[in-house]
Amino acid sequence: MKVLPVLFLTLLVLISIPAETFCQDYNHDRDIVPPRGKRNDFFRSDVSRDDESHPSPGQK
């Protein structure tokens, strides 16, 4: 039963390392991208386009 704690610790390390590097990359990229308003408009236009091209099953 000594294997379980070791597996758990290795899983934690494997999960935490990519999460930390991703957070650092995200914070670094946030300085470069335009203000949030433009970014939200971009996401909204993408969502509306998806809604038109993929109607929900009830609208057939």
UniProtKB/Swiss-Prot annotation:
A Gene Ontology cellular-component term: extracellular region
Tissue expression remark: Expressed by the venom gland.
Subcellular localization: Secreted
Propeptide: 37-60
Superkingdom classification of source: Eukaryota
Region (Disordered): 36-60
Entry's family note: Belongs to the non-disulfide-bridged peptide (NDBP) superfamily.
Annotated protein name in UniProt: Antimicrobial peptide Eval151
Taxonomic source organism: Euscorpiops validus
